[in-house]
């Protein structure tokens, strides 16, 4: 999305941010307009795109750089590049469609920072409000949702933010739009946008010399929006921004957003009851002073005597009150927050957690088919009747015939760990049942283990895998902060709720550390998954969050290998010898270099120099934001 792509260019001295074409030309004039002088700016048409402005024969030439679906950048019909900087470097050696070679970058003057676009100023608040309203999340659940799904939320907000803008009137008729525009002031350039039909087209209604003009806004096959024969835009707010600077095919520029009738009539409680205007020439220069209004608070009225044509008292990018559109869920793919396992079932204050987490067996129904089995027994799908809802659950059932007290102790130890954990990226325990067998009742993750899912779905793209391993790193960061060591982190113990939602499971080997401890020391060597273990675990029986980081590196290797077994064909002792020699597993085929570099960082031999999950999660997050957008 725009924000992350722009962030990746901010370090370039010749990147000017969200400036207009005219501003770019002024800068090139300042630089002497010599052939090959160039600068880079943010695209005002395409989300995540850029524009290249080049001087040649005393004229400025402009090229749109679009971000492709695979995350590369290209001028239309040209070669794809990993970044805008790479594209500029290439065209300094090959014109390849440009009017001339790029010879000299025009750098920002001292003290000048890249100009911020209107969406960057508002998106954080819009995202937060959208997540709060849509999923009723608060606190850590809200923060986790924003971090893990930020690219998707940015895209969602960018393409639907118009629903919250005062100039968007939704599904009203042509006649209604004319009546609305003609109410109140008759300022030239007063406008509104309405939805025309279900095909995604709109209409711009513009007041000029007392008449209402109608311009159709069509959506092409690629989703771009434009008036007939006009420039194409990714979003309505970009279109409005553009035509507030220049008419460019309209009879005049957009000047005054036409408010909804309730606000125009000055109804009590309407957020913008005062008639207002803003001067022509665009929105970006004025949006810097924007502050997101607190719920229930009006923005202060302009001081008396101020000149309405030159002083802005109405921000066209200020969201109006009210909920987001009801059809939004139909326009996007499901996010983790849409599932019933994103929040704990006990997050609802009306759902009372049973004392000592023991559940009533009569409220639990089990299916006959097994989801899986192991030394402990079996796992079955079930349904648990809570106070308000019936919850789909996974039930780990202890073998009855063995009557082994050690197995029971292990199950209860796992339950003891799980009852203390509450995070969207960790399988939560609902409770335990003592009936025909001991049962551990947990959240259900329908798609099963990550390794098996990837083995069967090799079409899954890298960015989807990065999304999932990032979620695992978020869950592990939570464990680290909560002073728990997992000790069995592997792809087989990551369960998928959906193709885009992973949860860490299987806490049978997990240990809680005391506040004064940073590692757990086992007394004896058990049935350990040695191929996932750090050297200090094997050599000294020491386990910490840093040893979980080593295991996470192996999990990443499994994920990018589409579920292959690590160190295939090797015995545990051979793996240990290999690690002692400083050797590591090779890069999986097709795995991004940045991800393999992170694996090797996780496999740092010296535990003191190995990063913790705070650093690992942040590095993954930044890379994930970059490739997904």
From Swiss-Prot:
GO terms for biological process: adaptive immune response; amyloid-beta clearance; angiogenesis; apoptotic signaling pathway; B cell differentiation; B cell receptor signaling pathway; beta selection; blood vessel morphogenesis. Autophosphorylated. Phosphorylated on tyrosine residues by LYN following receptors engagement. Phosphorylation on Tyr-317 creates a binding site for CBL, an adapter protein that serves as a negative regulator of BCR-stimulated calcium ion signaling. Phosphorylation at Tyr-342 creates a binding site for VAV1. Phosphorylation on Tyr-342 and Tyr-346 enhances the phosphorylation and activation of phospholipase C-gamma and the early phase of calcium ion mobilization via a phosphoinositide 3-kinase-independent pathway. Phosphorylated on tyrosine residues in response to IL15. Ubiquitinated by CBLB after BCR activation; which promotes proteasomal degradation. The active site is at residue 488. Keywords: Adaptive immunity, Angiogenesis, ATP-binding, Cell membrane, Cytoplasm, Cytoplasmic vesicle, Immunity, Innate immunity, Kinase, Membrane, Nucleotide-binding, Phosphoprotein, Repeat, SH2 domain, Transferase, Tyrosine-protein kinase, Ubl conjugation. Autoinhibited. Intramolecular binding of the interdomains A and B (also called linker region) to parts of the catalytic domain keep the catalytic center in an inactive conformation. The phosphorylation of the interdomains or the binding of the SH2 domains with dually phosphorylated ITAM domains on transmembrane proteins disrupt those intramolecular interactions allowing the kinase domain to adopt an active conformation. Changing residue 194 to A: Loss of interaction with FCER1G and TYROBP. Changing residue 544 to Y: Constitutively active protein tyrosine kinase activity. Causes an immune dysregulation disorder. Treatment with SYK-specific inhibitor ameliorates the disease phenotype. Belongs to the protein kinase superfamily. Tyr protein kinase family. SYK/ZAP-70 subfamily. This is Tyrosine-protein kinase SYK. It comes from Mus musculus. The gene is Syk.
